[in-house]
Amino acid sequence: MKVTVGPDPSLVYRPDVDPEMAKDKASFRNYTSGPLLDRVFTTYKLMHTHQTVDFVRSKHAQFGGFSYKKMTVMEAVDLLDGLVDESDPDVDFPNSFHAFQTAEGIRKAHPDKDWFHLVGLLHDLGKVLALFGEPQWAVVGDTFPVGCRPQASVVFCDSTFQDNPDLQDPRYSTELGMYQPHCGLDRVLMSWGHDEYMYQVMKFNKFSLPPEAFYMIRFHSFYPWHTGSDYQQLCSQQDLAMLPWVQEFNKFDLYTKCPDLPDVDKLRPYYQGLIDKYCPGILSW
């Protein structure tokens, strides 16, 4: 069965990326008008309307039992091939190839950090949420903290939050909202999507990866933080120490997509070895 999740807005619409970084890379997010931008706006409008404290807590309760599926990491990678990116009708290759492309980009730049290579393979596996019936706005796109007022660098911030009930609630509508200053992102309730879900899967199944890996997975779509420099009032010193790692990962997530597809069959044994080392066996999803 093919499930359409549409374009991941985090990858196709980046109004906040430094133009200098974008030179010769414009084709990765060259969407500034037309029907795709309309679709991305609609995704964010739905997300910014429905992602509330109550909604996110309900999703943690719904998926926190990890009873939806039993499978290995490599089986989850293969499941990504059932997700169709409807924004690319002329590009016919499996979504799992992006996982291997990202991992191989990291492997080339950081040959001595095998755990980092594995993060590249793992980072989008939370998108299997779409196969469990979740709508696109609860799977993909930039993430942000719920329970406090959205900050300026949140995509479409000025035009998509008007119908979010939390912004009418005095507990959640200030800069700090329900949080204490510099409480740490580990105490922040993030909007629900593939980042948060995969982070929770990793914790539940006790992946033996370093803290940097957990940060990369949980916050790689948190562009208002790692690119927009917002939400500093919530950050601990630990968060700031981890920020460069998240930023380093982001370079490979955005810019490793290319028409030169990796030979997945040749790569599988290497990555299976990493899976066996850090997250072996049949996992609970």
Swiss-Prot record:
Q: Name one GO cellular component term.
A: cytoplasm
Instruction: Respond yes or no to whether keyword Phosphoprotein is given for this record.
Output: yes
Sites binding Fe cation 2 sit at: 124, 194, 220
Cofactor note (record): Binds 2 iron ions per subunit.
**Which InterPro entries does the record cross-reference, listed alphabetically?**
Inositol_oxygenase
Any idea which UniProt keywords this protein has?
Cytoplasm, Iron, Metal-binding, Oxidoreductase, Phosphoprotein
Report the cofactors.
Answer: Fe cation
Record family assignment: Belongs to the myo-inositol oxygenase family.
Q: Which PANTHER family match?
A: INOSITOL OXYGENASE, MYOINOSITOL OXYGENASE
The protein's name in its UniProt record = Inositol oxygenase
Task: Please report the organism this UniProt entry assigns to the protein.
Answer: Pongo abelii (Sumatran orangutan)
